[in-house]
Amino acid sequence: VRSRRQRQMCIRDSTRDAWEDTFEILDTEGVPTNTVFHCFTGGPDEAKEGLQRDIYLSFSGIVTFPNAPELRDALAITPSDRYMVETDAPYLAPVPQRGKPNQPAWVLHVGEKMASVRGIELNQLAEESWRNASHFYGLDG
């Protein structure tokens, strides 16, 4: 983490059931300018902790799972300039494709669910997430 921060490189973090440790490490070493919680699995509390540190949250097919209401609550409180959409293919296929190897084309299912949770049109979600990803990866000029 320290090396990436010093070199101004992004971090794509995949935290699973280790939020306290993750935040402690980030606070100790310093949060790199562009950090994203890839395949975010936390709830509203973890989202708030990450957002307070200017971390992006990237949502995968898990957001479509019936047993993920806390993840959807986290999505609902995420500002429009701090989220991204992903599939995590070949894993975590979204509803209605559960049980199959995931594929990039199914990002549409993830986006549709995210737009519904946020109460916005799919086009708006696509524009916001594209702008966020472009900024994160330095593709916005």
Regions found by a protein language model. Give the residues of each.
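Glycine-enriched alpha-helix->loop->beta-strand junction motifs that scaffold or abut catalytic
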Residues: 27-34, 49-60, 79-82
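Conserved, mostly hydrophobic/aromatic
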Residues: 38, 50, 88, 125, ...
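Short acidic/histidine-rich active-site segments
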Residues: 81-103, 125
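Catalytic beta/alpha-barrel core
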Residues: 12-16, 34-42, 61
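Single conserved hydrophobic/aromatic residue that forms the stacking wall/gate
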Residues: 1-11
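Mid-to-C-terminal alpha-helical segments outside catalytic/metal-binding sites
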Residues: 105-141
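Active-site glycine- and acidic-residue-rich loops that bind
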Residues: 58-73
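Glycine- and Gly-Pro-enriched alpha-helical subdomains that act as flexible
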Residues: 12-29
